[in-house]
């Protein structure tokens, strides 16, 4: 098993050298506090250290809903709200003593899904001559990795709420909503798109659900979005969206291609959801 792991580590090292990834920027006060701009199509490098905990801090309005890694047996992942704690751990090799974390062999990929975004990481167990502050600085090991998000749309919306940059008459408001049993608490009060983005508007103080685009085969994919005042602005237009929060579920259907559809946002109960 460990021989196979060593072979996999060699392949992983080749992959790391063959593909580009985003290297976080060290902090001016301390290089172990690192920042990286968020981009949905970039892989971010995370350097950890045996015996130390690294935390990844996402947007304060995000909540982690899924974590997966290629070599999950060699790492401990502890999500708490919008923070993910990471620590290397011994590999429980069958029929032989447990293998302690070893730089190179423990390198893997890490995938994180929140209720707002998808994140991709190369997770590397760094090495140095000694576990001293100077060695940790040289290794660029991260105590904290935090993301910087583009244009802070929440702050901009507080100053002057923005909407679609098209005339109101050009908006598609032909959307229908199917509400599952007991799911009224996550129901939007309006839905529309401008051909590029979709807006779902909620009542003040209403919690935002996770939003998924539904493919023709029924597969659901978490969408990228940002918050504009009381609206979720989805960075795409989809035929069907699913809103989920715990057991609550709502189906939003884009009826723009249906000439018989009402031009106003409609809602009807659908207990089968």
Curated annotation (Swiss-Prot):
The record's family statement is: Belongs to the TrbG/VirB9 family.
Question: Can you name this protein?
Answer: Type IV secretion system protein PtlF homolog
Which NCBIfam families does this UniProt record tie to the protein?
VirB9 (TIGR02781)
* Gene Ontology CC: one annotated term: cell outer membrane
- Superkingdom in the source lineage: Bacteria
Question: Pfam families this protein is in?
Answer: CagX
Report further notes.
B.parapertussis strain 10978 harboring a functional ptx-ptl promoter from B.pertussis produces the PtlF protein in a stable form. Is also able, but less efficiently, to produce and secrete the pertussis toxin (PTX).
Main localization (coarse): membrane
Q: Which CDD domains match?
A: VirB9_CagX_TrbG
Keywords on this record?
Cell outer membrane, Membrane, Signal
Which positions carry the signal peptide feature in this UniProt record?
A: 1-20
Localization per Swiss-Prot or TrEMBL: Cell outer membrane
Give the stretches traversing the membrane.
Answer: none
């Amino acid at each position: 098993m460990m021989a196979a792991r060593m072979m996999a580590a060699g392949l992983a090292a080749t992959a790391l050298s063959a593909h580009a990834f985003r290297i976080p920027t060290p902090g001016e006060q301390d290089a172990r506090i690192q920042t990286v701009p968020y981009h949905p199509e970039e892989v971010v490098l995370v350097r950890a250290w045996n015996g130390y905990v690294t935390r990844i801090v996402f947007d304060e309005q995000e909540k982690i809903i899924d974590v997966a890694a290629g070599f999950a047996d060699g790492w401990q992942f502890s999500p708490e709200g919008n923070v993910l704690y990471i620590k290397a751990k011994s590999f429980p090799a069958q029929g032989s003593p447990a293998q302690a974390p070893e730089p190179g062999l423990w390198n893997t990929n890490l995938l994180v899904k929140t209720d707002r975004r998808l994140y991709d990481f190369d997770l590397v167990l760094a090495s140095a001559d000694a576990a001293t502050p100077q060695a940790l600085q040289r290794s660029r090991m991260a105590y904290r990795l935090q993301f910087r998000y583009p244009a802070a749309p929440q702050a901009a919306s507080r100053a002057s709420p923005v909407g679609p940059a098209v005339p109101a008459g050009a908006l598609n408001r032909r959307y229908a909503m199917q509400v599952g049993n007991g799911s009224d608490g996550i129901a939007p009060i309006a839905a529309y798109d401008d051909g590029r983005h979709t807006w779902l508007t909620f009542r003040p103080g209403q919690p935002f659900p996770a939003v998924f685009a539904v493919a023709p085969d029924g597969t659901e994919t978490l969408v990228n979005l940002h918050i504009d005042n009381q609206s979720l602005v989805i960075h795409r237009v989809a035929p069907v969206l699913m809103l989920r929060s715990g057991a609550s579920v709502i189906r939003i259907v884009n009826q723009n291609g249906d000439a018989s559809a009402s031009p106003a946002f409609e809602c009807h109960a659908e207990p089968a959801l």
